[in-house]
Amino acid sequence: KNWAVLVAGSNGWPNYRHHA
């Protein structure tokens, strides 16, 4: 789940949900 935190912190929460 480290990648999720990195993406969410880099692009934002919306990006994390889109990736998931």
From Swiss-Prot:
UniProt record similarity statement: Belongs to the peptidase C13 family.
Protein name per the record: Hemoglobinase-like protein 1
Keyword Hydrolase applies: yes
Main EC class the enzyme belongs to: hydrolase
Alphabetical list of InterPro entries matching this protein: Peptidase_C13
One term of GO molecular function: cysteine-type endopeptidase activity
Lineage: Eukaryota, Metazoa, Spiralia, Lophotrochozoa, Platyhelminthes
EC number: 3.4.22.34
Sorted UniProt keywords: Hydrolase, Protease, Thiol protease
Pfam family, one: Peptidase_C13
GO biological process: proteolysis
